[in-house]
């Protein structure tokens, strides 16, 4: 007997023209739509096939839904796939010219000048198509972020003019063979630099109707899910990813020039160590044990320094099983480096030099603008020297009370004091209320908010920094600094703890915090402790979030804008795939941009 509580499974049927599996209801709709289209084509079968008729067809396509457009276009391209002479997905097209170079080299051509002696072969995507009668078609082609007009005249065509152009639509990737020139319009003074095409080759058709340039593609949710379409329509993400690449390139160049060695360390570990964070857990079938995706590469990098690689760095992914918000992603990119015989004072000087010179190199100056989610606009001055704030004195000034000495901040009495401070200052802290978490919450409220221009925050208690070396002068404090910009953390560094006895005690304290319910506390890593027993030289360690710096230098308050493919929540659309309503625009001459 069937289970009355069971969910009835939807039966999907094959839609042969598109190769999709759809519901019975959807299939009926499509068959009916095709029957109407077939009847329309039958009536028009005797009409001569002229480019004006195709233009009318393109205008009709403006009224189609996204699915209808896809179906008609797919059918047309499938027919081309069956032919031998005009296969729409050729293996090769020889490109001899970069579009950016073309615009630079030929920008000074005179009005009406045509260089028929200069062969040009470029490729790009069609953004607009404008038809002017049977013998003239204009295209705007884009590649590598730049645009050029392509002028196609029947008199210049080396192959069938109508056959070349009637199949092309907005979004298609095409190869252009022609020569450079400047148009000679009657109503304009200078004309427009163009490629006068002798042949246009379809290299890869776009089966979907693109959003028009007029309405654009601005929905953030869809832009992140369809980053390829975002890049096709919008130029800003291209510039963001180029800036990100420049940041990574500059970091490598800077460190390589200072005799650092780039290394790679494991992404999966038996113990989640190197940072205070919640890890992702995976399982290795052959080893029959759980592994942790790394939260930081720190411990491995320091073991390499123990082995004699005195200057090492790694640029790579980290994974933290924590909340997703405007500034945090579960998968993110960092740069960490470790330098033997350096301390946190050396690293502060190096940080100022590295970041300020990088900003100057990438942006051309030391000042950038950053707009927060609330619309507050900051002007950030990256030029050194940077401001420095001592954590505990700053908290005492903000709270109006004397805090316990650094070597007493881990005690139960200090815990009681911190709870009173939270209550007095009306600050909420989520459990577990460990001393480290409460102090960190107060710092976030009253110290970090003062950091607009790049600011060093120093004087962290040892209980907040299990891998940092104790301060040489102040008990209970460690030699650590963080850099904050517009109230957000950018990087973290310290003089590394190289005392194996002290390190083991710190790990045990972290284990106690984990027992109290702090999931982010670190576990004891015996392998790392053993490595320290062989001797780690005095070392400075440094780590920076590349995503966060990219946000600052590209003026983006959301981390998803600087990630090519950010982590997204499930799309909750029910039933059939949502049909996007694609708005198409019309050119000034009345031709439809498809």
Swiss-Prot record:
<dbReference type="Pfam" id="PF00152">
    <property type="entry name" value="tRNA-synt_2"/>
</dbReference>
<keyword id="KW-0030">Aminoacyl-tRNA synthetase</keyword>
<protein>
    <recommendedName>
        <fullName>Lysine--tRNA ligase cla4</fullName>
        <ecNumber>6.1.1.6</ecNumber>
    </recommendedName>
</protein>
<dbReference type="InterPro" id="IPR044136">
    <property type="entry name" value="Lys-tRNA-ligase_II_N"/>
</dbReference>
<dbReference type="GO" id="GO:0005829">
    <property type="term" value="C:cytosol"/>
</dbReference>
<keyword id="KW-0648">Protein biosynthesis</keyword>
<dbReference type="InterPro" id="IPR002313">
    <property type="entry name" value="Lys-tRNA-ligase_II"/>
</dbReference>
<dbReference type="InterPro" id="IPR004365">
    <property type="entry name" value="NA-bd_OB_tRNA"/>
</dbReference>
<dbReference type="GO" id="GO:0005524">
    <property type="term" value="F:ATP binding"/>
</dbReference>
<dbReference type="InterPro" id="IPR006195">
    <property type="entry name" value="aa-tRNA-synth_II"/>
</dbReference>
<comment type="similarity">
    <text>Belongs to the class-II aminoacyl-tRNA synthetase family.</text>
</comment>
<dbReference type="GO" id="GO:0004824">
    <property type="term" value="F:lysine-tRNA ligase activity"/>
</dbReference>
<keyword id="KW-0067">ATP-binding</keyword>
<comment type="function">
    <text>Involved in self-resistance to cladosporin since this product is an inhibitor of lysyl-tRNA synthetase. Cla4 may not be inhibited by cladosporin, thereby imparting cladosporin resistance. When cladosporin biosynthesis is switched on, transcription of cla4 will then be necessary for continued protein synthesis in C.cladosporioides.</text>
</comment>
<feature type="region of interest" description="Disordered">
    <location>
        <begin position="1"/>
        <end position="62"/>
    </location>
</feature>
<dbReference type="GO" id="GO:0000049">
    <property type="term" value="F:tRNA binding"/>
</dbReference>
<keyword id="KW-0436">Ligase</keyword>
<dbReference type="InterPro" id="IPR012340">
    <property type="entry name" value="NA-bd_OB-fold"/>
</dbReference>
<dbReference type="GO" id="GO:0006430">
    <property type="term" value="P:lysyl-tRNA aminoacylation"/>
</dbReference>
<keyword id="KW-0547">Nucleotide-binding</keyword>
<dbReference type="InterPro" id="IPR034762">
    <property type="entry name" value="Lys-tRNA-ligase_II_bac/euk"/>
</dbReference>
<dbReference type="Pfam" id="PF01336">
    <property type="entry name" value="tRNA_anti-codon"/>
</dbReference>
<dbReference type="InterPro" id="IPR018149">
    <property type="entry name" value="Lys-tRNA-synth_II_C"/>
</dbReference>
<dbReference type="InterPro" id="IPR045864">
    <property type="entry name" value="aa-tRNA-synth_II/BPL/LPL"/>
</dbReference>
<dbReference type="InterPro" id="IPR004364">
    <property type="entry name" value="Aa-tRNA-synt_II"/>
</dbReference>
<comment type="subunit">
    <text>Homodimer.</text>
</comment>
<feature type="compositionally biased region" description="Basic and acidic residues">
    <location>
        <begin position="18"/>
        <end position="42"/>
    </location>
</feature>
């Amino acid at each position: 007997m069937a289970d009355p509580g069971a969910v009835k499974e939807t039966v999907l049927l094959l839609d042969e023209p598109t190769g999709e599996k759809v519901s019975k209801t959807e299939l009926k709709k499509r068959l009916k739509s095709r029957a109407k289209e077939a009847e329309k084509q039958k009536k028009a079968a005797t009409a001569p096939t002229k480019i004006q008729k195709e233009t009318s067809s393109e205008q009709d396509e403006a009224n189609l839904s996204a699915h209808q457009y896809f179906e008609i276009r797919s059918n047309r391209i499938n027919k081309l796939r069956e032919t031998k002479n005009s296969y729409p997905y050729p293996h090769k097209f020889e490109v001899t010219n970069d579009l950016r170079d073309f615009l630079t080299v030929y920008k000074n051509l005179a009005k009406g000048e045509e260089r028929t002696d200069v062969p040009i072969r470029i490729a790009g995507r069609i953004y607009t198509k404008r038809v002017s009668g049977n013998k003239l078609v204009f295209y705007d082609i884009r590649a590598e972020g730049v645009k050029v007009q392509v002028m196609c005249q029947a008199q210049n065509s080396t192959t069938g003019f109508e056959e070349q152009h009637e199949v092309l639509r907005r979004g298609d990737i095409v190869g252009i063979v022609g020569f450079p020139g400047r148009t000679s319009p009657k109503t304009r003074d200078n004309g427009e630099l163009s490629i006068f095409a002798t042949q246009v080759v379809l290299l890869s058709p776009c089966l979907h109707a693109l959003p028009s340039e007029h309405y654009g593609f601005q929905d953030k949710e869809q832009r992140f899910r369809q980053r390829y379409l975002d890049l096709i329509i919008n130029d800003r993400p291209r510039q963001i990813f180029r800036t990100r690449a420049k940041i990574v390139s500059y970091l490598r160049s800077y460190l390589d020039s200072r005799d650092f060695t780039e290394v790679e360390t494991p992404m999966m570990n038996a113990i989640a160590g190197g940072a205070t964070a919640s890890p992702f857990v995976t399982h290795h079938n052959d080893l029959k044990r759980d592994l942790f995706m790394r939260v930081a590469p720190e411990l491995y990098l320091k073991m390499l320094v123990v082995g004699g690689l005195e200057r090492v760095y790694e640029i790579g992914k980290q994974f933290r099983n924590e909340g997703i918000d405007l500034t945090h992603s579960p998968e993110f990119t960092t740069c960490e480096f470790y330098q033997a015989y350096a301390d946190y004072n050396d690293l502060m000087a190096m940080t100022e030099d590295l970041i300020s010179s990088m900003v100057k190199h990438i942006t051309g100056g030391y000042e950038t603008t950053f707009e927060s989610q609330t619309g507050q606009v900051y002007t950030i001055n990256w030029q050194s020297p940077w401001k420095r704030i001592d954590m505990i004195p700053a908290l005492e000034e903000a709270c109006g009370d004397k805090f316990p000495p650094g070597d007493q901040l881990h005690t139960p009495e200090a815990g009681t004091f911190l709870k009173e401070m939270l209550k007095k200052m009306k600050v909420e802290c989520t459990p577990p209320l460990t001393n480290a978490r409460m102090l960190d919450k107060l710092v976030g409220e009253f110290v970090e908010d003062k950091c607009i221009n790049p600011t060093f925050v120093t004087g962290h208690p040892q209980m907040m920094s299990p891998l940092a070396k104790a301060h040489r002068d102040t008990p209970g404090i460690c030699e650590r600094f963080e850099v904050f910009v517009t109230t957000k953390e950018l990087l973290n560094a310290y003089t590394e703890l190289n005392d194996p006895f002290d390190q083991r005690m710190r790990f045990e304290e972290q284990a106690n915090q984990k027992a109290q319910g702090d999931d982010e506390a670190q576990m004891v890593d015996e392998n790392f402790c053993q490595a320290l027993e062989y001797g780690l030289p005095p070392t400075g360690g440094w780590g920076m979030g590349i995503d966060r710096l990219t946000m600052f230098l590209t003026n983006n308050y959301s981390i998803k804008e600087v990630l090519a493919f950010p982590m997204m929540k499930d799309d909750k659309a029910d039933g059939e795939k949502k049909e996007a309503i694609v708005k198409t625009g019309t050119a000034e001459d009345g031709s439809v941009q498809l």
